[in-house]
Amino acid sequence: MTNVYSLDGILVFGLLFVCTCAYFKKVPRLKTWLLSEKKGVWGVFYKAAVIGTRLHAAVAIACVVMAFYVLFIK
């Protein structure tokens, strides 16, 4: 279990958020519903989706490293 109030918990949450938003960008219905706004509070979802799609290799490597850390080291 990961504590959200620690640094590694925030990193896990951020990676999962970016990966989820990048997945939402690939689903047409979710893209129009959730990622239509580019500013404001709802714009955070759009920005995370853009980060997830443009840096997909780095995000994937970070997810694998974080999974290894959470499962075996922590």
Curated annotation (Swiss-Prot):
Pfam families: DUF1242. GO terms for cellular component: Golgi apparatus; Golgi membrane. The chain crosses the membrane at residues 53-73. It is found in: Golgi apparatus membrane. Keywords: Golgi apparatus, Membrane, Signal, Transmembrane, Transmembrane helix. Involved in the early part of the secretory pathway. Belongs to the KISH family. This is Protein kish-B.
